[in-house]
């Protein structure tokens, strides 16, 4: 009761539609950034940018789908329009299957892939780790699946190797942003790379890939000097393109892009001589957990608001399922005593539950630079092998 059949609703409508006469730069959709360095910002897409982005996605060395394919986007539509998949499907005649509420569940994904004959899918690394775990435990397979696209966080090497070796599925790393509609790069090998083997092959596959047609990239140093594409030099990643935003929604015009039209992505990257880009760090120390971004600044500010806390730092620590999870380091005020439970309880109702740190370490002092900034690099080195407790996220 209360449910409507989609096919019945379609049958009740006529096949004619009077298309409105719209200017190509008329807005057609808007998504918001995750707000890791402040409030979420609106990014408005217009018909022209969306069509051009979709053309690029449909190219053979990008998504390369056709009417004979069936795609399964494991990303919500509010997250940059499900990575653009909801547009590339209708453009190419590709069948689209939406996963529903259990989009991260390995058993559900395997069932959908098998029963709907999915050939191409896309999602964050956590999704594929869950699928792999279920396949390995159940002994089931994904017979029709040909390609996976991974983005939103660093792809574990095990996803690439196990999917190919056990299930003959090719995994392609991709990179993009809300500000880019979202696609920026896809890792598709160029001719002449067939000779790569072993660790060299895996290292190449783990890179974010080359810029898709229409996207320009460069890396610069602190003085905005362009750096070489040698795979060694790393700098601030900047992009241009027909589907890169010009300004955030309701922002002061001309305040989003640099004077020469480049967009500062906030990522630090290298680009090799073949044009393959690799993200090496986050300029704002953002923690990427299961494809979602967690602001270390927000967590630090909340912790420091606690009456017993003098100073705090949050770093990302490796997690086998979520890629990274936040670890909170706390320096208490002199003479104060506290506990992990007390500090974590302080976060309840102040930040999203899934962003609360997994663990708390109490320290006598935190390392600082000469200018008074906490040395996050030193902390990451010190706690790089830290084992987080098992918690529900």
Write out the residue ranges for each language-model feature.
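Conserved S/T- and glycine-rich ATP-binding loop of Class I adenylate-forming
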Residues: 27, 33-36, 44, 71, ...
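Conserved beta-loop-beta connector loops within the AMP-binding
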Residues: 211-238, 273-274, 336-340, 375
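Conserved AMP-binding
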Residues: 74-79, 153
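AMP-binding/adenylate-forming catalytic core of the ANL superfamily
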Residues: 114, 121, 241, 246-247, ...
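ANL superfamily adenylate-forming
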Residues: 1-24, 135, 201
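Conserved AMP-binding/adenylation subdomain of ANL enzymes
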Residues: 51-70, 80-119, 134
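Gly/Ser/Thr-rich phosphate-binding loop
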Residues: 91, 118-123, 132-203, 216, ...
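Conserved adenylate-forming
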Residues: 13-26, 30-72, 84, 94
């Amino acid at each position: 009761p209360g449910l409507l059949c989609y096919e019945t609703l379609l049958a009740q409508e006529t096949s004619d539609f009077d298309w409105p006469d719209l200017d190509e730069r008329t807005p057609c959709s808007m998504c918001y950034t995750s707000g890791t360095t402040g409030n979420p910002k609106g990014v408005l897409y217009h018909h022209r940018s969306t069509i051009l982005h979709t053309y690029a996605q449909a190219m053979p060395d990008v998504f390369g789908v056709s009417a004979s394919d069936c795609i399964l986007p494991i990303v919500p539509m509010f997250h940059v329009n499900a990575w653009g998949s909801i547009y590339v499907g209708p453009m190419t005649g590709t069948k689209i299957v939406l996963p529903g509420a259990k989009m991260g569940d390995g058993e559900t994904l395997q069932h959908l892939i098998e029963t709907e004959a999915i050939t191409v899918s896309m999602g964050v690394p956590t999704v594929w780790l869950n699928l792999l775990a279920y396949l390995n435990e159940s002994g089931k397979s994904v017979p029709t699946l040909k390609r996976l696209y991974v983005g939103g966080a660093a792809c574990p090497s095990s996803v690439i190797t196990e999917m190919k070796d056990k299930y003959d599925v090719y995994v392609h790393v991709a990179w993009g942003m809300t500000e880019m509609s979202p696609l920026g790069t896809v890792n598709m090998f160029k001719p002449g790379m067939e000779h790569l083997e072993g660790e060299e092959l895996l290292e190449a596959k783990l890179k974010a890939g080359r810029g898709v047609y229409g996207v320009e990239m460069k890396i610069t140093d602190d003085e905005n000097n362009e750096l070489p594409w040698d795979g060694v030099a790393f700098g601030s990643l900047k992009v241009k393109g027909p589907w890169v935003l010009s300004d955030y929604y309701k922002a002061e015009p001309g305040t989003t892009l640099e004077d020469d039209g480049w967009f500062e992505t906030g990522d630090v990257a290298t680009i090799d001589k073949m044009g393959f880009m690799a993200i090496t760090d986050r300029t704002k120390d953002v923690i990427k957990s299961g494809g979602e971004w967690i602001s270390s600044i927000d967590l630090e500010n909340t912790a420091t608001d606690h009456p017993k806390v003098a100073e705090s730092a949050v770093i990302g620590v490796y997690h086998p399922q979520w890629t990274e999870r936040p670890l909170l380091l706390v320096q208490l005020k002199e003479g104060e005593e506290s506990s992990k439970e007390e500090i974590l309880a302080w976060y309840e109702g102040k930040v999203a539950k899934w962003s609360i740190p997994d663990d708390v370490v109490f320290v006598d002092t935190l390392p600082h630079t000469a200018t008074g900034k906490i040395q996050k690099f030193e902390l990451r080195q010190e706690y790089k092998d830290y084992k987080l407790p098992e918690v529900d996220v």
